[in-house]
Amino acid sequence: MKHLFKLDPAKNLPMNDLTKLVHSGTDGFIIGGTDNVQIEAVQKLYELLGETDLPIFLEISNESMILPEADHFLIPVVLNTENSKWTHGLHQELIKEMGAFIPWKRVTAEGYVILNKDAKVAHLTEAKTDLTDEDIVAYARLAENIFHLPIFYVEYSGMYGDPEVVRKAGAALSNTKFWYGGGIRSKEQAAEMAKYADTIIVGNIIYEDLEKALETATIFRKKTV
């Protein structure tokens, strides 16, 4: 997977726009959000995407994101916070409550480093965003070599990140997949971050300028002679 669209169930998107996203050349979708997430909206969005053969990931920020019928679940583990609630606290509580029913083969953990200090998710998780390049590289190595996380996710959350930081983080990883998300609003930015990340995630621009969002996926289409 090189490209994923991230959809917020709290935001409305016409069916025609969803159809365009499905046929854009993207490799799949993440359904996830921070604010005002209701299970009914998650269910509706998941069902609207249900006709596609593309993978649909539910990113579990709270219990309202859990649909038992989903094929793929993403579990964020925020690495750059001192609040253990976001590294393992909420996770342990949910496992305690539902552990016997969790379909572990459909669950993937992602090690998050959140780097936009103004983002809602940074405030919510109390993320320490004032990091050096060396700090971020160390988190990448921590994710891969200590926690053995399958995904390391650098999240600028609405702000376009520093390509050099992304390059260094990606170069530090061998087996863990490197995902980048944040502020991609053009095919040029998509191509730039795709040089360093295994997968780029495109979100906000979907709701701001759909055509530009679609262009970010077209760069990955296989060319035919």
Curated annotation (Swiss-Prot):
Q: Offer one example of a GO biological process linked to this entry.
A: glycerophospholipid biosynthetic process
| Family of the protein in this entry | Belongs to the GGGP/HepGP synthase family. Group I subfamily.
Q: Which keywords label this protein?
A: Lipid biosynthesis, Lipid metabolism, Magnesium, Metal-binding, Phospholipid biosynthesis, Phospholipid metabolism, Transferase
Matching InterPro entries:
GGGP/HepGP_synthase_I (IPR039074), GGGP/HepGP_synthase_sf (IPR038597), GGGP_HepGP_synthase (IPR008205)
Quaternary data: Homodimer.
The role this protein plays is: Prenyltransferase that catalyzes in vivo the transfer of the heptaprenyl moiety of heptaprenyl pyrophosphate (HepPP; 35 carbon atoms) to the C3 hydroxyl of sn-glycerol-1-phosphate (G1P), producing heptaprenylglyceryl phosphate (HepGP). This reaction is an ether-bond-formation step in the biosynthesis of archaea-type G1P-based membrane lipids found in Bacillales.
Instruction: Give the reaction(s) catalysed.
Output: sn-glycerol 1-phosphate + all-trans-heptaprenyl diphosphate = 3-heptaprenyl-sn-glycero-1-phosphate + diphosphate
What gene is it encoded by?
A: pcrB
Molecular function (GO) terms for this protein are: heptaprenylglyceryl phosphate synthase activity; magnesium ion binding
| SUPFAM superfamilies for the chain | FMN-linked oxidoreductases
Instruction: List cofactor names only.
Output: Mg(2+)
| Residues that hold sn-glycerol 1-phosphate according to the record | 6, 153-158, 183, 203-204
Q: What class of enzyme is it?
A: transferase
Protein's pathway: Membrane lipid metabolism; glycerophospholipid metabolism
Q: Which domain of life is it from?
A: Bacteria
- The name under which this protein is listed is Heptaprenylglyceryl phosphate synthase
Sequence positions that bind Mg(2+): 8, 34
EC number annotated for this UniProt entry: 2.5.1.n9
Pfam families this protein is in? Answer: PcrB
